[in-house]
């Protein structure tokens, strides 16, 4: 009987020990699971924070690129404007130089007879008149072309004068006809540059 009691007691202690080990194993497994879940959550949190940081960095990079592109566009526009200004200045200088180089002071033909000067003597303000009238050489060429439409087409420039009427001025040119002794064509050119023959056979 004593042996039976001793055996039951030993079995009871063995089962209790096994149950305790099982509970400890369960607790250990539970702790491992909780730790794994915590680590996984921490990893997700860290990954999320990293993604946010990466997105923020990407946003900064995009903003930086946009600023850089905007700065480059502004610089290119400034350079383009500067180039255009330089080109305009060059064109203005060339135009001014061309005007200066193309200006010809009024002059008489070789061995000129006083024909236009005799018909239309001018005693007014020559400087004021020339400021209103077109370029002398341009007006002379237009008058010569007009004179050659009547009679001989190789008339030679002789002399000029200026006619004034109500504050408006005209050039008066005379052209000698080499084929007709003592005959001249009288041509006027107004301030608009319009040439007109007033007498194709003026006799000196």
UniProtKB/Swiss-Prot annotation:
Biased amino acid composition, Low complexity: 71-102
Domain of life according to the entry: Bacteria
Region spans: Disordered: 17-102
Disulfide partners: none
GO cellular component, one term: plasma membrane
Organism: Staphylococcus aureus (strain N315)
Signal peptide coordinates: 1-17
Lipidation (N-palmitoyl cysteine): 18
Residue positions bearing lipid (S-diacylglycerol cysteine): 18
Primary location class: membrane
Keyword Nucleotide-binding: no
Source organism phylogeny: Bacteria, Bacillati, Bacillota, Bacilli, Bacillales
Membrane topology: Lipid-anchor
Cell membrane in keyword set: yes
Record's keyword terms, sorted: Cell membrane, Lipoprotein, Membrane, Palmitate, Signal
Protein name: Uncharacterized lipoprotein SA2158
Subcellular location field: Cell membrane
Biased composition annotated in UniProt, kind: Basic and acidic residues: 23-70
